[in-house]
């Protein structure tokens, strides 16, 4: 059984989003072990580019600490490659077969990720060309993970 660890900046504040994420996590429990680790946003006292970059570096260090060399790291970033649900399913299927990978998804804060953090990914993906709040992006990730597992298993959820 594949293990998925989601490392994200910020907490889910809205209860309806937390409930939806919990529902998808529960649905996935027969396919994988999923865990989410949340890290606090770095303070950004002003909008000076160097202040924002320092916050991104600080957040990136937290997000990328403890990643094992065997982990398959998927970074979610607006600059990443867009893939279909079937494409994500193929990435997960390969990791299940080739193992002993743990899939690690990294979701940065509102200012994005540092260059160092981006370089630690095996692949950089974008959920959409549109911009979403990070809470919604996390919910979309859970839904797409569940959809990917149903595609892999040939279940009727994905049509």
From Swiss-Prot:
One Pfam family per UniProt: SPOUT_MTase
Keyword rRNA processing appears in the UniProt entry: yes
Alphabetical list of Gene3D superfamilies matching this protein: 3.40.1280.10
Annotated localization: Cytoplasm
Entry-linked SUPFAM superfamilies: alpha/beta knot
UniProt xrefs under InterPro entries: Alpha/beta_knot_MTases (IPR029028), RlmH-like (IPR003742), tRNA_m1G_MTases_N (IPR029026)
Family the entry assigns: Belongs to the RNA methyltransferase RlmH family.
The protein, known as: Putative ribosomal RNA large subunit methyltransferase H
Gene: rlmH
């Amino acid at each position: 059984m594949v293990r998925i660890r989601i490392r994200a900046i910020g907490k889910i504040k809205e209860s309806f989003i937390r409930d939806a994420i919990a529902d998808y996590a529960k649905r996935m429990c027969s396919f994988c072990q999923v865990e989410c680790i949340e890290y606090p946003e770095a303070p950004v006292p002003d909008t000076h580019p160097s202040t924002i970059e320092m916050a991104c570096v600080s957040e990136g260090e937290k997000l990328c600490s403890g990643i094992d060399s065997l982990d398959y790291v998927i970074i979610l970033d607006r600059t990443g490659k867009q893939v279909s649900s079937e494409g994500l399913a193929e990435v997960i299927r390969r990791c299940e077969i080739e193992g002993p990978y743990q899939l690690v998804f990294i979701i940065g804060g509102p200012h994005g990720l540092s260059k160092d953090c981006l370089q630690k990914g095996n692949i950089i993906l974008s959920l959409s060309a549109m911009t979403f709040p990070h809470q919604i992006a996390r919910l979309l990730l859970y839904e797409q993970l569940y959809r990917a597992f149903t595609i892999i298993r040939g279940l009727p959820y994905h049509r």
